[in-house]
C-alpha cells in the first residue's frame, strides 16, 4: 500500500490545537519547544486568543509547527509517506515531510511568509 501525507493550509487553526499531543508525546513537544519564532507558540496555540491565532503572522508558523509535530509522531511510529502534498501554506509542511527542510527551517520560512 502506498501512503501520501496531505497538509492543510491556513484556516484550519483552532485554539487548543496540539495541547493533548504536546502533553502526551515527546516528539511533538520537541518540535514546538524548538520552533524558531518570536512569540510564545504554545500559549497561543493552547490558550489563544482566537483573534491572535487567526492573524497570519502567527497562524502560519503555528500551523507548520503543528504539522511538523504530527509528522514527527508518524515518523516515530515508522509511518513514512511515498508522497507529500500541501494546500497553499501546507506546501511548507509537505516540503518538510519530503526532507527538503528541517522542521525548524519550515517553521522559520512560514514565519517569514506570515510576516510579509
Set out the residue ranges of the language-model regions.
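FabD-like malonyl-/acyl-CoA
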Residues: 1-116
Amino acid at each position: 500500500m502506498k501512503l501520501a501525507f496531505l497538509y492543510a493550509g491556513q484556516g484550519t487553526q483552532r485554539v487548543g490545537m496540539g495541547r493533548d499531543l504536546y502533553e502526551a508525546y515527546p516528539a511533538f513537544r520537541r518540535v514546538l519547544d524548538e520552533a524558531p519564532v518570536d512569540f510564545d507558540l504554545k500559549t497561543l496555540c493552547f490558550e489563544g486568543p482566537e483573534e491572535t491565532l487567526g492573524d497570519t503572522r502567527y497562524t502560519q508558523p503555528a500551523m507548520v509547527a503543528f504539522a511538523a509535530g504530527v509528522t514527527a509522531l508518524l515518523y516515530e511510529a515508522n509511518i513514512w509517506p511515498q508522497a507529500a502534498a500541501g494546500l497553499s501554506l501546507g506546501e511548507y509542511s509537505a516540503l518538510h515531510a519530503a526532507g527538503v527542510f528541517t522542521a525548524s527551517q519550515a517553521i522559520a520560512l512560514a514565519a517569514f511568509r506570515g510576516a510579509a
